[in-house]
Amino acid sequence: MSIRTILFDLDGTLIDTNTLIKASFEHTFKEYNLNFSNEEILKFNGPPLVDTFNKIDETKADRMITTFREHNIREHDNFVTAFPHVYDTLEELQNRNISLGIVSTKMRHTVHMGLELTGISKFFSTIITYDDVTHAKPHPEPVQMAMQKLGAHPEHTLMVGDNHHDIVSGQRANVQTAAVAWSLKDTNYLKSFHPDYIIEDIKDIITIVGDSFA
């Protein structure tokens, strides 16, 4: 099926926020006298903050979320950059009349901070954030909402992400899925969720789009 719409996760997929997120978790855990290994912190990267902190301590979750977000916003511009070839790839997709959207588990404010800082906001016709949905990824609602706003059809849509919940959300919404090999998650781990594609470089999407019209 030809691909006419591409939905992207943001953090870890288009922009590199990994160091910022790790630093924000470490800052928060230090404030609350909690100790987690790097491996454990890695697992916290991706799901909504409310889910992560509720699992740690429901009685302190709201305060920990506030601490995390304050640090994350304060340090944001010191850490965040776009991954290589992202700008040129998005520009080429736009030139090919591919509809582009963002589907993120972050709050709208911080999503826009990242998009504006890296100069890629102009490429996206819709942006779905944690604030916009009742059920975050891996529920299909965010992907379905993005498609509805773009007038897209599942059979012509691709969801691209760096985490299993991106892949599962896309699959539950009956769209094609692609996992990125530069994810902090092990590639074999992502393969276990059976995405349609594993991309080594964001530019690979150009080939996928071209092949879909062949």
From Swiss-Prot:
**Catalytic activity, EC:** 3.6.1.1
State the source organism's domain of life: Bacteria
> Which cofactor(s) does the record list?
Mg(2+)
Tell me if Glycosyltransferase is a UniProt keyword of this record: no
Catalysed reactions, as listed in the record: diphosphate + H2O = 2 phosphate + H(+)
Say what the protein does: Hydrolyzes pyrophosphate formed during P-Ser-HPr dephosphorylation by HPrK/P. Might play a role in controlling the intracellular pyrophosphate pool.
Q: Which family does it belong to?
A: Belongs to the HAD-like hydrolase superfamily. PpaX family.
How is this protein named in the record? Pyrophosphatase PpaX
